[in-house]
Curated annotation (Swiss-Prot):
Subunit and partners: F-type ATPases have 2 components, CF(1) - the catalytic core - and CF(0) - the membrane proton channel. CF(1) has five subunits: alpha(3), beta(3), gamma(1), delta(1), epsilon(1). CF(0) has three main subunits: a, b and c.
The family this protein is said to belong to: Belongs to the ATPase epsilon chain family.
GO molecular function: ATP binding; proton-transporting ATP synthase activity, rotational mechanism
Membrane disposition: Peripheral membrane protein
Keywords of the record: ATP synthesis, Cell inner membrane, Cell membrane, CF(1), Hydrogen ion transport, Ion transport, Membrane, Transport
Function in brief: Produces ATP from ADP in the presence of a proton gradient across the membrane.
Gene3D superfamilies, per the entry: ATP synthase delta/epsilon subunit, C-terminal domain, F0F1 ATP synthase delta/epsilon subunit, N-terminal
A GO cellular component entry from the record: plasma membrane
Xref: Pfam families: ATP-synt_DE, ATP-synt_DE_N
Location(s) in or outside the cell: Cell inner membrane
Name this polypeptide is given: ATP synthase epsilon chain
Main location: membrane
Length: 141
C-alpha cells in the first residue's frame, strides 16, 4: 500500500475536500509543486489553476482554485484557497466567455480603467480555461 498524507482543501465557503492522498500537485508562484508523504514543511502561495490530488489507489481528483496558500506539515497538507471548484463542475464555454470579456476590458480602456484588476481577471479566467482543457485532454472529460 502506498504511503499517504492527510490533505484538506478549504475555502471561504468551507471545507471542500478532506482525506488521505498519495500526492498533491499545485501551481505555485515559481511553477508546479508536487507534495508527497514525507515532504519538508513549507508554506507557499498558489496561483490560479488546477490542484490535482492522487488519492489512495491512484484515483485522481482535480479542483480549480482562484489562488491561495499551500501549507505542508509532517503529516498534513492544507490548501487555503480564495475560491475552489471541482474541475468537473467547470464549464468551458463560461471560462472562454470570461477570457474574452477580460481581453475586451483590457482593449477598451476607459478613464477609470484599473490595469492591475483587469490583468488579474484575465489571468484567473485563462487559468480556469486551461484547467478545463487539461482535464478534457487527460481524462477525456
Amino acid at each position: 500500500m502506498a504511503m499517504t498524507v492527510h490533505c484538506d482543501i478549504v475555502s471561504a465557503e468551507g471545507e471542500i475536500f478532506s482525506g488521505l492522498v498519495e500526492m498533491v500537485i499545485a501551481h505555485g508562484n515559481l511553477g508546479d509543486i508536487g507534495i508527497a508523504p514525507g515532504h519538508a514543511p513549507l508554506i507557499t502561495d498558489l496561483k490560479p489553476g488546477p490542484i490535482r490530488l492522487i488519492k489512495q489507489g491512484g484515483e485522481a481528483e482535480v479542483f480549480y482554485i482562484s489562488g491561495g496558500f499551500l501549507e505542508v506539515q509532517p503529516n498534513m497538507v492544507k490548501v487555503l484557497a480564495d475560491t475552489v471548484q471541482r474541475a468537473a463542475d467547470l464549464d468551458e464555454a463560461s471560462a472562454q466567455a470570461a477570457v474574452l470579456a477580460a481581453e475586451k476590458a483590457l482593449n477598451e480602456k476607459g478613464a477609470d480603467f484599473d490595469y492591475g484588476s483587469a490583468t488579474a481577471r484575465l489571468a484567473e479566467a485563462a487559468a480556469q480555461l486551461r484547467t478545463v482543457q487539461q482535464i478534457r485532454k487527460k481524462f477525456g472529460g
